[in-house]
Regions:
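Alpha/beta-hydrolase active-site loop
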Residues: 111-135
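Short beta-strand element of the alpha/beta-hydrolase
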Residues: 59-67
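Short beta-strand/loop motif that positions the catalytic acidic residue
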Residues: 228, 234-236
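Hydrolase active-site cap/lid region
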Residues: 161-205
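Short alpha-helix in the alpha/beta-hydrolase fold that links the catalytic acid
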Residues: 77, 230, 244-254
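Catalytic active-site module of serine/aspartate enzymes centered on a nucleophile-bearing elbow/loop
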Residues: 270-305
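N-terminal cap/lid segment of alpha/beta-hydrolase-fold proteins
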Residues: 25-55
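Conserved alpha/beta-hydrolase
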Residues: 82-105
Length: 305
């Protein structure tokens, strides 16, 4: 059982009870569609297009930092979070959908994890943090990040850039170098049955014994994480074939042992995508705990859709 099991069980128990304090805790009950507003903002000479989802009462607000691939804004997840009192800004990645600029591909491996591209994407996410922070200016709403997969390298860069970021959440975010992650992906070949035939020891040996042959400079997220003191939560799947979970947890434990306020949740049977019905309550509960959401939530009103 992972270290957040007790808080999550408490959260689920709270969600099941319809009490007078329900308005200050996450709820799984269906609610009206949250208000949302489309926005455009600028980053390094291009225009990005996104949507801000605004709950009637807001506990916190997050920028959703997407993973690799030609990803569009995550409106479905944004609605779920808004119904739990968490506002969000989600946007089309540069060069995708309605956003300008050039998408750096391919879908996996090589040049989408170059330091140049990661810095570019972190600049975009930093601009999104500024937009979201300005939207809630004067309301004392904590701003955070939720990074997905590749976002595990991007979000720490954003947090070192912007003092407005107060917490971080990582959905299958690597705490390993880009070289290690690419070597791991080639080793697993993204096959779901990989862990039926290989062990953690074999993975470690493969990562140690196979020198890199990649035409880009390595990026180590630990270098950024060592500079940060804000709270962080990482969610991992034990059967992930895109991110080496065991090594990521080892690095994360070392950071926590040095005094960093970092936590993790491990789902042994989950893959890289995790399970939304489990992961989302864990994220919401942790954010509530981290921002000290007690008493009345911030009543920010609604903007026209």
């Amino acid at each position: 059982m992972s270290r957040l099991a007790a808080p999550i069980l408490l959260l689920l128990a709270t969600m099941a009870c319809a009490t007078a304090s329900a308005r200050t805790t996450p709820t799984s009950e269906p609610t009206a569609s949250p208000a949302h507003e489309d926005v455009e903002f600028h980053s390094l000479g291009i225009t990005l297009s996104g949507t801000i989802f605004v709950p009637a009462k807001t506990v916190a607000a997050v920028v959703l930092v997407d993973g690799a691939g030609k990803t569009l804004r995550k409106t479905g997840l944004a609605r779920v979070l808004a119904n739990q009192g968490i506002a969000s800004l989600t946007y089309d990645k540069r060069g995708v959908g309605k956003s300008g600029g050039v998408y750096a591909g391919p879908e996996v491996h090589t040049n989408n994890v170059t330091p140049e591209n990661l810095q570019l994407l972190s600049a975009d996410a930093t601009a999104a943090v500024d937009v979201l922070s300005n939207r809630f200016a004067g309301h004392h709403v904590p701003i955070g990040l939720i990074g997905f997969s590749q976002g595990g390298w991007i979000a720490p860069l954003v947090a070192t850039r912007s003092p407005r970021v107060k917490f971080m959440v990582f959905w299958s975010g690597p705490v390993v170098t880009t070289y290690e992650a690419v070597r791991f992906e080639f080793f697993t070949d993204h096959k779901a049955e990989f862990w039926d035939h290989h062990t953690e020891a074999e993975v470690r040996e493969h990562l140690r014994s196979n020198p890199h042959q990649y035409p880009f400079i390595d990026t180590d997220p630990v270098e950024s994480l060592q500079k940060l003191s804000l709270p962080g939560l990482w969610l991992f799947g034990g059967r992930d074939v895109s991110v080496p979970t065991g090594l990521s947890i080892e690095r994360l434990r070392a950071l926590a042992a040095s005094g960093k306020p970092f936590e993790y949740e491990l789902y042994p049977e989950a893959d890289h995508q995790l399970v939304e019905d489990t992961a989302i309550p864990a994220i919401v509960g942790w954010i509530y705990k981290t921002v000290g959401a007690r008493g009345e939530l911030a009543d920010l009103g609604r903007r026209p859709q």
